Amino acid sequence: QITGKVVDAQGDAIIGANIIETGTTNGTVTDIDGNFSLSVGNNATIRVSYIGYLDQSISTTGQSIFNITLLEDTQALDEVVVVGYGTQRKVSITGSIASVKTEELQNIPASNLSNTLAGRASGVQIIGNSGLAGASSTIRIRGSFAEPLYVIDGIIKDKAAFDALDANEVENVNFLKDAASAAVYGSSAGNGVVLITTKAGTLQKPRFEYKTSFSTSRTTQTMQGFTATEELEFLNNVAVTLGQEKPYGPDLFEYFKDKSYDINDLIWQNPSVQQHNLSVNGGSDRIKYYLALGYHDENGSYHNTDFKRYNFRSNVSTNITDRFKINFNLSGNQRNYNRWYWPYDGAEDFIVSDWYRATFNWSRLYPFYVDEQGNPTNDPNDIPVKTTGGYHPPEIMLNGGYRNTQYRDLTGIIRFDLDLGEYIDGLTTSVQGHISAYDKNMKSFVLHNKWYIFQPASTTNRFIPGPVDFSQIGIHNLSAGYENIQENIDLSSSYQLNWFLNYEK
């Protein structure tokens, strides 16, 4: 048992400091007087930490009472944080702000910025709603029920523009969590503000940087936890419960003892992600520049599901005089979401619950594809046969059409900064103009879902397939009585003009 007290450099108690036994989850926090007690192992080492202070690791060997002084992390406190009306040092901020540096995010194989930020800012809930390629996450600040306001380089944008950013081009992300911090944005900031600052040029020789990554993943467990023989046993038990004879005998159990038709073998795959980013950063006393190109390619867990994103950014600033500066920030992105056609979930809905419902408990007793002699195969180039649902999910996914959506966004920001210090010391003014062009193109192509009627080998063994009868055809169309193609195009643009007058003393 060890006891002690944690104070700062002035001798004031630190309330809520963390004391953790290194290498374990055993720990405690200091009380209102800075005191603590903790049971630890022999010769243990404890780690003492608190936000804004430098961590300390202390050996407990030969000692049971500790007086610990934590020193301020001056580097963290001097760090500049972007707020609604400019920048401030962390030590001067009284409002509630959480900051995330993006160096740690750049190698995470996530499809968008929302997903990479999960768990990295206190008071910010980031929840993924779907595992489809390109799917985003919801962001809620301090338990609010609506989206926060998104501000990118001083321009109010929507969640889609935030998600379209490449983590490599982002300098930092700040979450303004209370009314005092977000007040400059008015009522639209009632659910908090997410402030994003993209990278800019620095005073150095041209520095070229190329980053690439590749990752893949697999399921930790099978989606269907039953076999064909277990399904036969279940159906027999249902019949007995209803007072009927068991419909399936030993011959079928013998036939299925080494085979099961798993729909997931045809519709699921191991997803993969590759990312590439090329940038150049440099500048002189007069001009600074940052140029970047990004590419993200993601293959989803379902076949025929993928997401691609292309990004570019050009951020150039020039000092016309010692007091007058111009900055031009041009960026663009294109996002391609491609997937199979399934009309019973929303056109832009990443929560494909109806598809999941339709495939989750699919029978293990019927093959999906056979050759001409009726031998079961897993080859989608073979002959599709009718399933119990009246439609053919693998054929729909692999050969039944598509729904492809493309988004493109081009944004230009120009800013003029003038230092008026020769008239009033600490006075500056800025004018910022912004224009964006956006388009969306959604194309859906629907094919007939064609299959052949399942032919059993005999009337007594209805699950054992026989040769295909090519005169017995079934067609299930998902939208109408004919094949069709549909295309929707949306075009929009926006502009914004801001004027700032700042005084800092």
Placement of each model-derived feature along the sequence:
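Short, small/polar-rich motifs associated with maturation and membrane association
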Residues: Q1-R313, T321, K325-N327, S331-N333
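Surface-exposed loop/interface segments of Gram-negative outer-membrane beta-barrel transport/assembly proteins
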Residues: T202-S260, G300-F307, N311, N315-D409, ...
